[in-house]
From Swiss-Prot:
The gene is wdr18. SUPFAM superfamilies: Quinoprotein alcohol dehydrogenase-like (SSF50998). The lineage of its organism: Eukaryota, Metazoa, Chordata, Craniata, Vertebrata. Residues 342-363 are annotated as: Disordered. WD repeats lie at residues 78-118, 119-158, 170-211, 213-252, 267-306. It comes from Danio rerio (Zebrafish). Keywords: Cytoplasm, Developmental protein, Nucleus, Repeat, WD repeat. This is WD repeat-containing protein 18.
Length: 431
């Protein structure tokens, strides 16, 4: 049997049978399960198609599994506090976590903590990257959502405080969910709130494009890939489908079921915590506190299949099937380093850095450090001077110094070659 194009990934708060599991989106049959702990809401993410990360419910660490080694919990990433939301960038270079009212940004290649963003006034509830990893959006219990430009966050030196690109402040109660559409910095983002509204914004301008008012608080939200419809999960168990192509659509709208695409999916008996649409837009996945995950046909609004969990569903999504998921003999290309709990320790010189290659962009340094190749050429010139002019004196001391320099040149050339090969693999790796 060929590997599926998409799979369903879900988790519940009980964790009695497994932490999270992978299912066939067509039949609902289980493919794989990952054991150890239980994952909190909005805190299950795939890192670079090679790892599954899940924040432990009520604890200050993140569980990590290699994606093809389902029966063994690989490691635990200890965090400065309880993680309330978690997201890995689609390009696999960064990990974001909401801890209390702060956003923590880690660099995956080194494990360095690059930034702590403390603009929210209350705990974070959700955080999402755009599809091109250029921006991320955070939402919290303070009724605020912030749009952040990733490059501006990682470029800033420690003497400057990163600022969000836009502040979205139209909600009057806590934000419960965020969904970013396609098109990177030109995308639209939807925010759901307990104030019974879902609002659609433009990332580039921060302008509100649409506000839809419902009769109940909204716990989850998503678009279909073409953004024909907006799907909103209510606290009463209903899922509301809002047509974004309706001729009667206005900026401020009250939801009413009609014949123009505004419809209701009925079946859940408790609040809907998760929503996700397949890449072709034909099926909708939902997870609920009624301990079920359901797959719906978008056109007919009928439930195709149901998966029963042992506790309230905290995470459920339709995701592209990672290439390594069904290959038992495959391994991650790069080991996952230990994540630091302090801001960029390699720069602070506390000796806790991993020594890996840093991908931090545009660091503000007065005297940029030379490349390994430049260092090697400089050492080679120095060796020639030693040989020709006996800079370090005559006899045995000169020979020892020359040997040391030759060894250092060989080491630097090897490091430069390894860096080049790693960068080439990273840039040519298919998405």
């Amino acid at each position: 049997m060929s590997a599926p194009v998409e799979v369903v990934l879900s988790a519940d708060s009980a964790g009695q049978l497994f932490n999270c599991a992978v299912y066939d989106p067509h039949t609902g049959s289980e493919f794989l399960s990952y054991r150890g702990g239980n994952t909190s809401s909005r805190s299950l993410t795939i890192l670079n198609g090679e790892y599954i990360l899940g924040a432990q419910l009520g604890k200050n660490y993140i569980n990590v599994w290699e994606i093809q080694r389902k029966d063994q919990l690989q490691q635990k990433i200890v965090c400065p506090g309880i993680v309330t939301c978690l997201c890995a960038s689609p390009d696999g270079l960064y990990v974001l976590a909401g801890i209390a009212e702060a956003i923590y940004l880690w660099e995956v290649s080194t494990g360095n903590l690059l930034a702590i963003l403390s603009r929210h006034f209350q705990d974070l509830s959700c955080i999402k990257f755009t599809d091109d990893s250029s921006h991320f959006v955070s939402g919290g219990k303070d009724n605020l959502a912030f749009i952040w430009n990733l490059s501006s966050v990682v470029q800033l030196d420690s003497s400057r405080t990163p600022e969000p690109r836009h502040i979205l402040s139209r909600h009057s109660l806590p934000i419960t969910d965020i969904h970013c559409g396609l098109m990177g910095p030109q995308a639209r983002v939807a925010t759901a709130s307990l104030d019974q509204t879902v609002k659609v914004w433009e990332i580039s301008s921060g302008e509100m494009l649409l506000s839809v008012l419902f009769d109940v608080g909204i716990m989850s939200v998503t678009f279909d890939p073409c953004e024909y419809f907006l799907f909103c999960g209510g606290s009463d168990g209903n899922i509301f489908q809002v047509s974004l192509c309706s001729t009667s659509l206005s900026r401020d709208k009250t939801f009413q079921s009609d014949s123009e695409g505004n419809q209701v999916f009925k079946g859940h008996r408790n609040l809907v915590t998760c929503l996700s649409v397949s890449m072709d837009g034909t099926v909708l996945l939902s997870g609920s506190n009624d301990e079920t995950v359901r797959m719906w046909d978008v056109q007919s609004k009928q439930c195709i299949w149901t998966i029963n969990h042992r506790g309230p569903v905290t995470n459920a999504a339709i995701i592209p099937a990672p290439a390594n998921m069904f290959l038992s003999d495959s391994h991650p290309a790069v080991p996952l380093p230990r994540f630091s709990r302090h801001l960029n320790p390699s720069e602070q010189g506390d000796g806790t850095g991993t020594g890996g290659m840093s991908l931090r962009l545009g660091a503000n340094t007065q005297e940029p450090e030379g490349t390994y190749l430049e260092k090697a050429e400089e050492l080679y010139s120095l060796m020639c001077a030693v040989t020709d002019k006996s800079v370090f004196g005559d006899g045995e001391n000169t020979k020892v110094r020359v040997s040391e320099l030759e060894e250092e040149v060989r080491t630097l050339k090897k490091i430069n070659k390894d860096l080049y090969e790693f960068s080439t693999q990273l840039l040519t790796k298919p998405n």
